[in-house]
Amino acid sequence: MKIKNTVQFTLIALFLISGALPGFAQAKNGFVKIFNGTDFEGWHLKIRSDDAELAKKVYAIEDGMVHVFKDFPKEYELNTGDNATHGLFYTNKKYSKYILKFEYKWGVGIANNFDQFQYDAGCYYHVADDKIWPLGIEYQVRYDHTQKKNHTGDFWAGGLKWYSKDGNSFLLPSEGGQPVLGHGGEHLAAPDVKSNALNGKWNKCEVIVMGDKYTIHKLNGKIVNMATELPYSEGIIGFQSETAEIYYRNIQIKEFDEIIPMENFLK
């Protein structure tokens, strides 16, 4: 019996060390997957129509991803003004100081008010409510194919201090960017950062936010936007369905107990 118990203990120890337990396996370099790839445990779905069954179809799960507008027609309710499937899937938990990572790629389907905002989606954070157009800060995910212009990494928010040289697009302070106050709505990300648009390839996105002190947007490893003196210090996180088929995957977060100086991430 003693030998048997020793063997069992050894096997359990090896099991734990190898990270075979699901909760342990999710963590890597301090990051934890907040979308488990199989269901929406820890999340809730919200669309304009308040149709729970339709929301489940909008946010389909396949192969560990959220596939927005998976089985919808290639042109769904296009430019009707209804926009019933505008919405987000939201975390139940609030977050304050963290690094959020996620990946996305575009599909081929288009929907809703596509002619107005082409290939449009996004990630909202520091959200104070769970409305369709919430109070919070948006990491814009968008590609305007009519101008071949990427908007991923733009801010949609007001009441924050942004940095720009020409008042048009973001520029790092170390490169001449100056504080801009009172700039509401869209704050354009740095131009000419490499991204994948309609080629079926993935983009890697990152939000580094420390309470109401600052936020940094990264796209494919490059800093594309930054702001300080934020209007919110915490909130839930949501990912949008808006005007085009999109895939989200590898949604993970690393939380911090204390504020990490912004300079640590600008090196």
Where do the model's predicted regions map?
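Bacterial Sec-dependent N-terminal signal peptides
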Residues: M1-A27
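Carbohydrate-interacting regions of secretory-pathway proteins
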Residues: Q26-K267
